[in-house]
Amino acid sequence: MAAVKTPVIVVPVIDRPPSETFPNVHEHINDQKFDDVKDNEVMPEKRNVVVVKDDPDHYKDYAFIQWTGGNIRNDDKYTHFFSGFCNTMCTEETKRNIARHLALWDSNFFTELENKKVEYVVIVENDNVIEDITFLRPVLKAMHDKKIDILQMREIITGNKVKTELVMDKNHTIFTYTGGYDVSLSAYIIRVTTALNIVDEIIKSGGLSSGFYFEIARIENEMKINRQILDNAAKYVEHDPRLVAEHRFENMKPNFWSRIGTAAAKRYPGVMYAFTTPLISFFGLFDINVIGLIVILFIMFMLIFNVKSKLLWFLTGTFVTAFI
């Protein structure tokens, strides 16, 4: 009997074809196999069902989608996802990335999935790489059996954890641990009804403030949501910080420092990703990242100690125009 496909949704955070998130499976899927879904659209009918018994590679289990809705640059209708404070002080990148996910959860697409009794959706931002998706089938079954609402597939905090067996078979040994404030939307599997309930609660509460991850954790506690984090997640979903770091430098005003930063991102991706991470918005006028904060602190140091070096002030000025 034909079964409803599980959607695998690629969320664009950089300029990159969706098939590059799955680099080793071009014989199965390519860019033409991805259906673009925008705001107010639903899944194309032709990809709703499939016979899965004869597919050892598992790719026929899924409907591959690229989500193109939730773009706050093109529309201000997503401001209700954020409080007035966050609309002023949260960085554009933070709001843009969160809005893409919340708009997806709040979309006609998810409502249709609920009506069609689709239980789970796999969501992956396109700065990740998944080389082998065969782990998804046993994971989805285990999530159903163990009543897991969200499986986060990117680890934020490392250290000792109390791990629980999720899948144990001849091909996969997978463990998880319970999530806390270490929330990430980079890659995850979510129950459709859970996504709808979370976004409904966010809207009813007046939108997210600057403490997004604390608020999501609070909502999870209040709604008794079971969020697990995939142990050793990088084995299954590889996040490439170089892609985002390069994207940030490419979107800066072209100058000497942006070219230096782009080159440095290739050699030191983790460091440059951290340095270019936006921290706060200055009343919506511009965002301040880690490098910008260091520059501001350095300017305060020079003012306090009355530094008169013209060279230092010149170099500081070039940093200000580049990173703030």
UniProtKB/Swiss-Prot annotation:
Query: Which GO terms of type biological process are on file?
Result: symbiont entry into host cell; virion attachment to host cell
Q: What induces it?
A: Expressed in the late phase of the viral replicative cycle.
The transmembrane segments are 285-305
User: Topology: which residues are Virion surface?
Assistant: 1-284
Any idea what this protein is called?
Envelope protein H3
The further comment given in this record reads: Immunodominant protein.
Instruction: Reproduce the UniProt comment on modification after translation.
Output: Does not contain disulfide bonds.
Q: Name one GO cellular component term.
A: viral envelope
Q: How does it sit in the membrane?
A: Single-pass membrane protein
User: Belongs to which family?
Assistant: Belongs to the orthopoxvirus OPG108 family.
Which keywords label this protein? Host-virus interaction, Late protein, Membrane, Signal-anchor, Transmembrane, Transmembrane helix, Viral attachment to host cell, Viral envelope protein, Virion, Virus entry into host cell
Subcellular location(s): the record lists:
Virion membrane
Main localisation: virion
What is the recorded function of this protein according to its Swiss-Prot or TrEMBL entry? Envelope protein that binds to heparan sulfate on the cell surface and might provide virion attachment to target cell.
Specify the domain of life of the species encoding this protein.
Viruses
The record, for Pfam families, names:
Pox_P35
Query: Which residues are on the Intravirion side of the membrane?
Result: 306-324
